[in-house]
UniProtKB/Swiss-Prot annotation:
Physiological role: Able to directly activate the TNF-NFkappaB signaling pathway.
Biased composition (Pro residues): 543-552, 602-624, 669-685, 709-718, 771-784, 894-906, 961-980
Positions carrying Asymmetric dimethylarginine: 320
Source organism: Homo sapiens (Human)
Region annotation Disordered: where it falls in the sequence: 23-44, 76-105, 133-162, 332-869, 885-1035
Signal peptide: none
Gene Ontology annotations of biological process type: cell differentiation
Protein's name according to its UniProt entry: NHS-like protein 3
Related illness: Genetic variation involving NHSL3 may be a cause of atypical endothelial corneal dystrophy (ECD). The disease follows an autosomal dominant pattern of inheritance in the identified patients. Clinical characteristics of patients with the atypical form of ECD include peripheral endothelial opacities, an opaque ring along limbus, central endothelial opacities, central stromal opacities and corneal edema. The early phenotype of this atypical ECD is characterized by multiple small white translucent spots located in the Descemet membrane of the peripheral cornea.
Keyword Lipoprotein: yes
Biased composition (Basic residues): 431-449
Highest taxon of source: Eukaryota
This protein's encoding gene: NHSL3
InterPro entries reported in the protein's UniProt record: NHS-like
Length: 1035
């Protein structure tokens, strides 16, 4: 009855509603014609609304609508009942298939009845109400007409059935397919089999011509099977390719598979092992390779990368056939995944050495293409190229081995040249693609670990791969040519020679490659954002062995800059095409001349100029700016002051090959050149790059090759991020003039420029170097060299500090404080570390510092904008505090040689240095003895004086960085906070609680590397320079 009532309800309501509406209508009509007799009759008829004859048309419409509404409601009710019962029953039946048919029926009946009775009534009432409400709106037509309601009901039903029922395949898996699905079961298996069609992959169907899939499997099978399989595959490929490619049969004459695959970069795979020679031409596809994956030789397999990883066996076979011809790229890729075949171990070892590379080698393939062609011997060819690069490397160390180191040195040079011509555009595009430096940094770390493993291979095989990486990194279009040939190929030698020595011959070497990869002359320089990451690699790599590492660093610089002109890599990238020829000639010694020329190249400074405009304000006031403008002229003289303090001899000794060139350059711009060479490379990366590079190039024609050049990439990223970096460029000039170690710093941050002049630069270098030694530790062999390198570096820094400023050591540590300031300051600081540690032995120190730089840079890059304002504020605070200190020690406005060079420094650099140095000074002073503090205060006061004069311009520039520096200043003002804020100064003592995470990271690194720092401290103490005091404090 309930159900009945529910069903009746809508009809009753509709009738009542109809009556009401009809009465209203009648009333209206009556009111219209009240006294009409016929009207009365009509009224009677109207009153009896149920008589169809008596209804007016409008009433008829209403009635029809009401009837439709009732019907729709009834229909909906029926559907609901069906849903409640039948659909539910269906669900039950599905479940019952698990349990049993009887239970199903029972459950179905019981649930159906209850569900229908309750839910149907409730739903009916609800639907009636809703429909009534809706009808009230205008007409009695239900919102759902019959068809609509039917459709909606059907849809609901379908949904329910799908949800309630288990899919057949699921049931089959669960073994629930019972009587219910028994009929369907046969279908499912058949359908499944058909869908799966494992046979498609099977040989017969593959032969039939599935297309890419078939060709892949067929290729794998054939490679293993032998000539017969290959012949069959060839036929299949011919059929497929002819059908596809030769729609117009005009090309039919050509071997379709070979032609098509070559176009696809699949030539080797498609053609089979037979057309090995064609494959090398296929490798000439390097332009395509640029756009394709580095596994282009395997492009035949649609998923080239996947194929390589998936079918190691097939890949190996392929590598034998096509990889030999295209071995460099394919072999390397294979080397990553698994050792290919014995024939390829050589190339594979390079690849394994360049496993890190291979990651970057997607682009590298393009570069590889060149190198592959040149070291086309495949795996066999590569060892030769690597040997050549090794033999050439010594010259690169002396000069910028970069061009010569290029893997099969000559072959790679030619490769680079050919790539430049054919693949340069593609390489550039690839470099653009590779501009994303974040991935390369990890690779670099990976390479550091692999370095030790691939130490032997790295020297031989790795050099070519670095080339490839660099080529891919060609981010700088102009450098592409130089980078690819001289930059890419030479870089590998640098890494091999410098890095292998630096980090453990093999271990070191790879990191350089990773850095090269990351920094790849083009990419590192071009993608400044990526630079910060890359420089850390370079820093980490070189530290292993100061002597060897350092010469490679110059090479590295060269690679960064461009083959030989790396120093002015920006210029090189600008003039890369013109300088590209140089890379071939550059083999090593030539770099000096090219470097000088490139230094001379003012264009690069012009390029940086845009960024440096803010610095230019300080620059114009400071002679340093002109110095930067004249790449090596001013820096050399200015740095001469600090140069005397610096110990170029140590760097020179370390860099015997480089030493000659560096010495010459250093003579041009003496002492500063060794550290500057490291730092200058960073400057080249930045706007200051040009200026700094020029000085570093002239100062250390060889040293630019050193990692210092790699460090430059980090500065570029900061520049991009911050104009503060632009400010820093002027400091670079000052840096150069003030402190040779600072040259790299200049691009990094003006603060570093000034502070490096002080012995703080030595202390900072020492501290940074300790991180460097930890970095080398990843490659166990490296640590010892790193330690020795730190000692060298420490000595150098002390010398530098002495020349720069007696109390400079702590200030330089203070420079570390700038880390908090702007990322630029941090970058500069790292560079400065590299510079002091890095002319010759600094290889270890700089390389180790570089990794910290990387973190700092990566962290700083984003912070830079904020730091700039913070820095500005900090500068103001510093100015205030310095005002007091100036009053205290106004006697020495520029008394320290450090002070004089700093005035030349751009106001930005001076301000940055003052801020960082002042903070450092405060912190250092607390730990340092009163005498040291007094010296530092005097130097700082003099510097602050000069800087305070320059600060007004700096304030606008660094206004963005002001906030962080301000916070730092308060911490500096409070001795306890100050020490934390200066992780560099007291990282060993306790990890600074600096607000800046980057600083903390650095501090952590330094703390971890305390052993290295302590070792450095020892040398510094031996030096007996003010730096030693700062070192003691640090210890």
């Amino acid at each position: 009855m309930v159900v009945f009532v529910g069903r009746r309800l809508p009809a009753l309501l509709g009738l009542f509603k109809k009556k009401g509406s009809a009465k209203a209508e009648n009333d209206k009509h009556l009111s219209v014609g009240p006294g009409q007799g016929p009207g009365s009759a009509v009224d009677e008829h109207q009153d009896n609304v149920f008589f169809p004859s008596g209804r007016p048309p409008h009433l008829e419409e209403l009635h029809t609508q009401a009837q439709e509404g009732l019907r729709s409601l009834q229909h909906q009710e029926k559907q609901k009942l069906n849903k409640g019962g039948w659909d539910h029953g269906d669900t039950q039946s599905i479940q019952s298939s698990r349990t049993g048919p009887d239970e199903d029926n029972i459950s179905f009946c019981s649930q159906t009845t209850s569900y229908v009775a309750e839910s149907s009534t409730a739903e009916d009432a609800l639907s009636i109400r809703s429909e009534m409400i809706q009808r009230k709106g205008s007409t009695f037509r239900p919102h759902d007409s019959f068809p609509k309601s039917g459709k909606s009901g059907r849809r609901r039903r379908e949904r329910r059935s799908t949800v309630l029922g288990l899919p057949q395949h699921v049931q089959k898996e669960l073994g629930l397919r019972n009587e219910r699905e028994a009929p369907g079961t046969p279908r499912a298996p058949g359908a499944r089999d058909a869908v799966r069609i494992p046979t498609v992959d099977g040989r017969p169907r593959g032969t039939s011509g599935m297309g890419a899939r078939v060709s892949l499997q067929a290729l794998e099978a054939e490679a293993e099977a032998g000539a017969e399989t290959e012949a069959m595959l060839q036929r299949h490929i011919d059929r497929v390719y002819r059908d596809d490619t030769f729609v117009g049969r005009s090309t039919g004459t050509r071997a379709p598979p070979l032609t098509r695959p070559m176009s696809l970069a699949v030539p080797g795979l498609t053609g089979g092992a037979g057309p090995a020679e064609p494959l090398s031409p296929a490798m000439s596809i390097s332009p395509q390779a640029t756009y394709l994956s580095k596994l282009i030789p395997h492009a035949v397999l649609p998923p080239t990368v996947d194929v390589v990883a998936l079918g190691r066996c097939s890949l190996r076979t392929l590598s034998r056939c096509s990889l030999h011809s295209a071995s460099p790229a394919s072999v390397r890729s294979l080397g990553r995944f698994s050792s290919v075949s014995s024939p390829q171990p050589r190339s594979r070892h390079p690849s394994s050495s360049s496993d890190t590379w291979s990651h970057s080698q997607s682009s590298d393939t393009i570069v590889s293409d060149g190198s592959t062609l040149s070291s086309k011997g495949g795996s066999e060819g590569q060892p030769e190229s690597s040997t050549a690069s090794n033999s050439v490397v010594p010259p690169p160390q002396g000069g910028s081995g970069r061009g010569s180191p290029s893997g099969g040195s000559t072959a790679e040079a030619s490769d680079t040249l050919s790539i430049r011509s054919s693949g340069q555009l593609s390489g550039r595009s690839v470099s653009l693609r590779k501009l994303k430096r974040p991935p390369p940094p990890p690779r670099r770390t990976h390479s550091l670990h692999q370095r030790g493993l691939a130490v032997p291979d790295g020297p031989l095989g790795l050099p070519p791969k670095p080339e490839r990486k660099q080529q891919p990194q060609l981010p700088r279009p102009p450098t592409t040519g130089g980078s690819e040939g001289a930059g890419a190929a030479p870089c590998p030698p640098n890494p091999a020679n410098s890095w292998v020595p630096g980090l453990s011959p093999g271990g070191s070497r790879r990191p350089p490659r990773s850095p090269e990869r990351t920094l790849s002359p083009s990419s590192g320089y071009s993608s400044q954002s990526g630079t910060p990451t890359l420089p850390p690699k370079g820093l980490a790599g070189p530290p292993a062995s100061p002597g060897k590492a350092q010469p490679p660093k110059p090479e590295r610089v060269t690679s960064l800059r461009s083959p030989g002109a790396s120093v002015s890599s920006s210029l090189t990238s600008l003039c890369s095409s013109s300088s590209d020829p140089a890379p071939s000639d550059r083999s090593g010694p030539q770099i000096l001349t090219p470097l000088g020329d490139r230094f001379v190249i003012p264009p690069h400074p012009k390029v940086p100029a845009p960024f440096s405009p803010p610095p230019s304000k300080p620059r114009s006031p400071n002679p340093a700016a002109p110095a930067l403008a004249a790449p090596a002229v001013v820096p050399g003289p200015v740095s001469t002051t600090d140069a005397s303090p610096q110990s170029p001899p140590t760097p020179q000794t370390t860099l015997t090959p480089l030493q000659e060139s560096p010495v010459i350059s250093k003579d041009q711009s003496p002492p500063p050149s060794p550290p500057p060479s490291y730092h200058p490379p960073p400057p080249p990366t930045k706007k200051p790059e040009v200026v700094v590079e020029a000085p570093s190039a002239s100062e250390t024609a060889e040293e630019p090759l050193q990692d210092p050049n790699w460090p430059p990439p980090p500065p570029p990223a900061p520049e991009e991020q911050d104009l503060s970096m632009a400010d820093f460029p002027p400091p670079e000039e000052a840096f150069f003039s003030v402190a040779s170690p600072e040259p790299a710093g200049p691009s990094g941050s003006p603060e570093l420029v000034s502070s490096p002049a002080a012995s703080s630069s030595s202390a900072t270098a020492l501290q940074i170097q300790p991180p460097g030694s930890p970095d080398p530790p990843p490659a166990p062999p490296a640590p010892a060299p790193a330690s020795s390198a730190p000692g060298h570096v420490a000595k150098l820094p002390q010398k530098e500090p002495v020349g720069c400023s007696k109390g400079g050591g702590p200030p330089r540590e203070d420079v570390g404080a700038p880390l908090v300031t702007p990322s630029l300051l941090q970058m500069v600081r790292l560079r400065s570390v590299g510079a002091p540690g890095g002319a010759p032995t600094p290889a270890l120190g700089p390389s180790a510092p570089q990794k910290p730089l990387r973190r700092a840079l990566s962290g700083r890059a984003s912070p830079v904008p904020a730091p700039s304002s913070g820095l500005h504020a900090a500068v103001r605070l510093k100015a205030c505090s310095l005002a007091a200190s100036e009053g205290l020690s106004s006697a020495q406005p520029n008394g320290p040689p450090e002070a004089e060079p700093r005035p030349p420094q751009s106001p930005a650099s001076t301000a940055s240095f003052i801020f960082s140095k002042g903070s450092r000074k405060l912190q250092l002073e607390r730990p340092v003895s009163p005498e040291t503090q007094a010296d530092l205060q005097r130097n700082l006061v003099a510097e602050l004086r000069s800087i305070s004069e320059q600060r007004p311009p700096q304030a606008p520039k660094k206004s963005p960085k002001a906030p962080p520096p301000v916070a730092r200043k308060p911490s500096v003002g409070v001795p306890p906070p100050a020490s934390p804020s200066y992780p560099r100064a007291e990282p060993l003592t306790a990890p600074p609680t600096n607000g800046l995470p980057h600083t903390q990271d650095r501090t952590k690194r330094e703390l971890a590397e305390n052993g290295g720092v302590l070792q450095l401290v020892g040398p510094e103490e031996k030096m007996g320079l003010p730096g030693s005091d700062s070192q003691k404090e640090l210890a």
